[in-house]
Structures are given as C-alpha cells and as structure tokens.
C-alpha cells in the first residue's frame, strides 16, 4: 500500500465545513467475518475520507483491545481491515456535525439500504456501532448490546455501544470486553460457516 496514503493529516476549518453531506466509501468485500455499521460519518471523518476518523473516537482502540487487529491501527490504515476479513459501512451515508441531525425516517431509509448491502455482501455478522440507531432501524425498542435474536439481511446482528468519546456510559475497558466478546463469537461462527460450505 502507498505509504503516502497512510500518512495522517488534519483537515482545515474550510475542509470541515465543506464535508457536510459528503460520503465515505464503504470498506467492504464478500464473506467478511464482521461488517461494522456506524451511524453516519461525522464531518472530520468525511473530510479525511476515513471511517471513525475523528481523534478521540474510541473505535480503533476498542478494535485493537478486543483482539481484532494485531496492533492499534490509525483511521488512515483502515484498508488493512479487509485483510482481516473486517469491513465498515454506515446506516446513513451523508456526513453531519452530529448524529442527532438525522431524522428517524432517514435512519429507517438508511436501514433498508444497509439491509440490501448486507444481503449482497453476506458477512457472518453485521455489528451496529450504536444501539439507538439499531432500535430505530430494527423497530426493536428494547434491544440491548450484544447478539440479537433477529438476523439482519440474512446475517447475524450484533449491537455495540457508540465508541464516541462523548459516550461516557462505556469506558475503554468495557468497550474492550464487548468488542472482544464479538470477536470470539463471530470468528467461531465464521469458521462453522466455512465448514458447511460445499467443496467446489
């Protein structure tokens, strides 16, 4: 991979303002172990074009602490996730300054688009990064963190807390445990899935 593409950089105020409604390309491939689905990109993330890109977002540290990555990746190294059979997408594509700028109707519409994507890509698990949007998308108002009873787009559904630094309900140790629980379960499920496939 081009090392220049991995070099972190900070967007200017003008670039942040211009990032409104921008989209960040999905990081996907078929047959992933886990496809992480964020709520929608923030302005910083959209400006740099990398998922969970804002400094202070705890997604990347939680991913490492949970055992998904061999070391702490920066957002600029996100493409390396595909080698680990991990991907990232969003419920709503457009960037906003705050997630609460999205309406429930917009989240539901985004959920339908996401469901179509999941059916196409067929990850073993789709992990929603944020319980509030999952409750709206699924219509399950009492959904809790962890494995869900209902599948989503044919894949197992799992809910993780929002790793934003603004979410004080979950500290790094708790996030590490929850991400680790997902990794153990999803990896085992993926292996079982592989064994069931016919040999071509």
Model-derived regions, located:
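Short hydrophobic segments within beta-strands
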Residues: 35-37, 129, 160
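Short, solvent-exposed loop/turn segments at secondary-structure junctions
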Residues: 40-44, 93-96, 132-134, 164-166
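Short glycine-/acidic-enriched loop or helix-start segments at secondary-structure transitions
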Residues: 45-48, 135-139, 169-170
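C-terminal capping/extension of enzyme domains
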Residues: 1-25, 29-30, 55, 98-114, ...
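Short amphipathic alpha-helices and their capping/turn segments at secondary-structure boundaries
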Residues: 23-29, 72-81, 117
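Short, surface-exposed acidic-centric catalytic microdomains
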Residues: 45-105
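Short, hydrophobic/glycine-enriched beta-strand segments
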Residues: 28, 33-39
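Internal catalytic-core helix/loop-beta-alpha segment
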Residues: 83, 87-140
């Amino acid at each position: 991979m081009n090392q220049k593409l991995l070099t972190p950089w900070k967007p200017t105020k003008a670039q942040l303002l211009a990032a409104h409604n921008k989209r960040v390309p999905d990081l996907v491939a078929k047959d992933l172990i886990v496809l992480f689905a964020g709520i929608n990109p923030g302005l910083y993330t959209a400006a740099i074009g990398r998922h969970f890109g804002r400094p202070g977002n705890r997604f990347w540290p939680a991913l490492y602490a949970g055992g998904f990555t061999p070391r702490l990746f920066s957002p600029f190294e996100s493409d390396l996730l595909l080698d680990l059979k991990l991907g990232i997408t969003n419920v709503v594509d457009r960037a906003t300054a705050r997630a609460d700028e999205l309406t429930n109707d917009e989240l539901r519409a985004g959920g339908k688009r996401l469901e179509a994507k999941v059916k196409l890509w067929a990850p073993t698990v789709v992990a929603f990064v944020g319980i509030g949007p999952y409750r709206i998308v699924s219509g399950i108002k009492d959904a809790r963190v962890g494995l869900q009873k209902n599948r989503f787009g044919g894949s197992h559904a799992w809910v993780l807390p929002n790793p934003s630094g603004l979410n004080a309900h979950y500290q790094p140790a708790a996030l590490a445990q929850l991400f680790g629980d997902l990794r153990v379960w999803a990896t085992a499920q993926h292996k079982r899935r592989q064994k069931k496939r016919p040999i071509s």
